Amino acid sequence: MSKINLNKISHSYNPNDANPTYALNPFSMTWEDGKRYAILGPSGCGKTTMLNIVSGLVRPSSGKILFDDKDVTELKTESRNIAQVFQFPVIYSTMTVYDNLAFPLRCRDFSKEIVDERVNSVAETLNLKSFLNLPARKLTADQKQLISLGRGLVREDVAAVLMDEPLTVIDPDLKFKLRRNLKEINEQYK
């Protein structure tokens, strides 16, 4: 993982207006390597916009983003090595759980041996081993969210895993358990 520095970033979805409205007012923040952070605020305050700026899905109107003191503001999303887990699970429903987890590695032409080792390791960590051969569409919402998280963890070159309200679709009884799992995963992968 990486140290991430947000240096005076801001974002307006209508920057060319005479009086632009900012979804994200200028601010600075540093996320230290290996730490967990929670971004709290009311709906519409810019939390998702900020995460999308860090991942490269959205370009800031002003400011710089640094990963380990390297300016990545102009880098494309795929060059930033960020994994993002969204509010609703993003999975390939026609693929098996194994193939969902393997997808990021296969796209980067990793060998079958490395794919097998990483997928099995992450599946073990996320308690998905017994589901590897099942179609992803047959899993529960919380298991699908674990697949989304697993696709981020399967790559060893990920600078950070950003989660945008990842527990929204999770059954209330399972939220506590998943929070504990996320804490353990952070300790393991930092």
Label every model-predicted segment:
Residues L153-V154, V161:
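ABC ATPase C-loop
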Residues E74, P135-L139, Q143-Q145:
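Conserved ABC ATPase signature
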Residues L40-P42:
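The feature captures the beta-strand-to-loop junction immediately N-terminal to the Walker
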Residues G63-D71:
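Conserved ABC transporter NBD signature motif
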Residues L149:
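Hydrophobic anchor residue at the start of the ABC signature
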Residues S55:
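Helix-to-loop junction immediately C-terminal to a conserved catalytic motif
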Residues M95-P104, P135:
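Short coil-to-helix segment of the ABC ATPase nucleotide-binding domain corresponding to the Q-loop/switch region
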Residues D71, R106, E113-F131, N181-Q188:
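Conserved ABC ATPase "signature" region
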